[in-house]
């Protein structure tokens, strides 16, 4: 069953199989930290590197990417841990902690938790705003239609004539930059609906400007499924307009009336066609604290176990994760925020820095499967021996060529430049 944020903070045990909440979901981080400090919840953190919650965790258990399921199984079956898990409600905070590994490893670790605590609840943590609402509304692969990577592969193969980017910037978000470049080069018509001009839509055939948050009315759905209203505060710039208006006028131009002429019509259409949004039928229910969506049917975790290959002793297993401030368009476009984005660097344990034979701040050559980048290296006590951490989407060096979206894990060689 799914947990709410309140249920998570009231749990006796909070198990973290998630990214660094302090960096990616700072408000949730504050709630969980408060639960550990004042409500006596005990945090059991499984992490490939130290996070912002590590100082507040009852137990922090490290693992090398690809081996978390085994570590979770061995940890939770100890006598001490079984006693703690039996003290009350257990909630698992689950998200993708590493962009350089197959997400199935995290799901396998979650399955191991259920094997020990069948009645545990789960709080799925999705980083981007309103992703939960988009998933509930059906913006996920249907009937084997393929996900974003499948669409890009089809475009790169010349099988898609018109590609529409609905608020998407694959050049910045997709790890395989080469795939995106080939896909955008092959499509005959590229249409973008976005608030900003970005690296993906800069050469688009058509860009339809969409109003940003604060420039339109509507609702948003947070990671726990809580629907709340958003209110227009300023007038959209230039000819920008809410995206639902763009969709309505496009449908009319194409000879199809979707039956939406106001925000009220749109909300009614949503709640009548998507049962999960039924509690938000009354617009007033989304004011204040909002209203929780109807809980979805529980899902089953299945599939063949995937095992990561062992790491060569000369290599370092890569950890790639996001930070609070990166080169996201809204950050780059803000004069007060753009200056706090850090340059790209690779972080290793101080003892590994000596093993590589370099001093902190010097440039090193980082290689993976025939691809090399030159990047500054820094020491970090929170990075485990034998692993290397790369913050994603920072300024300077583009680290995406090192990533393999088809692989289970990424191992890199770090060498001094002679």
PLM features: what roles do these ranges have?
Residues 3-5, 10-16, 22-52, 56, ...:
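A cross-kingdom feature strongest in bacterial/archaeal respiratory oxidoreductases
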Residues 17, 21, 61-64, 95-102, ...:
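Generic alpha-helical structural element
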């Amino acid at each position: 069953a799914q947990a709410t944020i309140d249920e998570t903070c009231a749990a006796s045990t909070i198990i973290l199989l998630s990214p660094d909440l302090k960096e990616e979901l700072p408000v949730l981080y504050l709630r969980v930290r408060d639960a550990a400090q004042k409500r006596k919840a005990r945090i059991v953190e499984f992490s490939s590197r130290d996070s912002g919650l590590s100082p507040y965790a009852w137990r922090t258990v490290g693992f090398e990417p690809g081996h978390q399921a085994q570590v979770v199984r061995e940890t939770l079956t100890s006598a001490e841990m079984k006693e703690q898990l039996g003290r009350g409600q257990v909630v698992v905070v689950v998200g993708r902690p590493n962009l350089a590994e197959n997400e199935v490893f995290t799901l396998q670790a979650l399955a191991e938790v259920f094997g020990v605590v069948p009645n545990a609840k789960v709080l799925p943590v999705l980083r981007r705003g309103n992703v939960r609402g988009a998933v509930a509304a059906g913006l996920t692969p249907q009937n084997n239609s393929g996900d974003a990577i499948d669409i890009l592969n089809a475009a790169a193969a010349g099988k898609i004539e018109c590609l529409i980017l609905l608020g998407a910037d694959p050049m910045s978000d997709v790890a395989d930059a080469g795939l995106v470049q080939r896909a955008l080069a092959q499509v005959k018509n590229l249409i973008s609906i976005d608030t900003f001009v970005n690296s993906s839509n800069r050469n688009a055939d058509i860009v339809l400007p969409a109003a940003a948050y604060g420039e339109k009315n509507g609702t948003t759905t947070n990671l726990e499924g809580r629907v709340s209203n958003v209110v227009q505060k300023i007038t959209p710039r230039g000819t920008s307009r809410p995206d639902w208006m763009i969709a309505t006028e496009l449908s009319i131009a194409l000879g199809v009336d979707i039956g939406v002429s106001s925000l009220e019509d749109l909300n009614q259409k949503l709640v009548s066609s998507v049962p999960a949004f039924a509690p938000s039928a009354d617009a007033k229910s989304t004011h204040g604290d909002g209203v929780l969506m109807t809980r979805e049917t529980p899902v089953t975790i299945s599939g063949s176990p995937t095992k990561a290959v062992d790491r060569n002793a000369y290599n370092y297993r890569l950890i790639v994760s996001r930070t609070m401030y990166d080169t996201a368009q809204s950050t780059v476009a803000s004069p007060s925020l753009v200056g706090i984005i850090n340059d790209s660097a690779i972080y290793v344990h101080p003892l590994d820095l000596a093993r590589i034979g370099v001093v902190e701040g010097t440039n090193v050559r980082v290689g993976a499967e025939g691809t090399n980048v030159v990047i500054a290296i820094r020491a970090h006590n929170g990075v485990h021996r034998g692993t290397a951490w790369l913050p994603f989407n920072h300024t300077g060096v583009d680290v995406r060529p090192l990533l393999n979206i088809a692989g289970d894990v990424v191992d890199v060689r770090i060498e001094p430049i002679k």
